[in-house]
Amino acid sequence: DTGRKAAVKWDFNAWGAKYDDLLYDDIAGQHVVESSGVPYFKPGIVMEGGSIDVNGNGLVLTTEQCLLNRNRNPHLDRGRIEEYLKQYIAAPDVIWLASGIEGDDTDGHIDDFARFSSASSVLCAFSDKGENAPVLERNWSLLEKAKDRFGLELQRLPMPEPLYLE
């Protein structure tokens, strides 16, 4: 940790190779880091921006469904992913939530239902009905277990019911 700016260029595989026409988007990230003028690192693992949320003080929120998905980095387990986060973004602590909401084709991106609103505050969606209620309750329970350890304030936000267009 020298305090100097640098970038991390994670690999992008279109959310587990779901969209062949978007696989080329990985090149866009390479162009961004190259044109930024700052040194950059390439860990060589798949990670999309919405798969993690960081509080700025070394704490990451993520889901097992996303980062441990075999369509991303089948050769990595939880411990190895934590090592990458510690090494490349100086985040030694990770709160692993279970999974994301139904119908999310990104395989459980955290940014669909939980975010840091400050370094010590987490907003998390909840629903008392519908298909997302059980997983949101499970994720809330995991946050509750972690809040004292990390000194977090938790706030629930109601998740609206899905709207389907015909």
What do the PLM-derived regions correspond to, one by one?
Residues 1-166:
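The feature marks the mature, well-folded catalytic cores of soluble enzymes
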